[in-house]
């Protein structure tokens, strides 16, 4: 098997870090769902439901990002596809939020460019 490119290692670590932040957001959302009824948040209609669903969303997203990190780390083709899809969605989102999305366009464009380089695709077998 080919040696993992350094950039792929960096991306896998970044995906793990992002997953950690998603799990932290899930924990905060879960906490807010619990205390919403006993604080001023309870005055907001459906606050508990919103925070509960936010926590579920963040948990699922964090799990998917961890799975993607594993796929990148191990050189799995599906990990490459997930990273390309998430990067493309992020790029589209940044394009839709111009002009503030310029930094995202540059960073995500560079990541997408890197993921499509021959040596990276060969590592993933795609």
From Swiss-Prot:
One Gene Ontology cellular component annotation held by this UniProt entry: plasma membrane
Predominant subcellular localization, coarse grouping: membrane
Disulfide partners: none
Subcellular location(s) of the protein: Cell membrane
Keywords: Cell membrane, Membrane, Transmembrane, Transmembrane helix
Record keyword GTP-binding present: no
Membrane topology: Multi-pass membrane protein
Transmembrane segments: 13-35, 50-72, 77-96, 101-115
UniProt entry tagged with the keyword Transmembrane: yes
Full protein name: Uncharacterized protein AF_0864
Lineage: Archaea, Methanobacteriati, Methanobacteriota, Archaeoglobi, Archaeoglobales
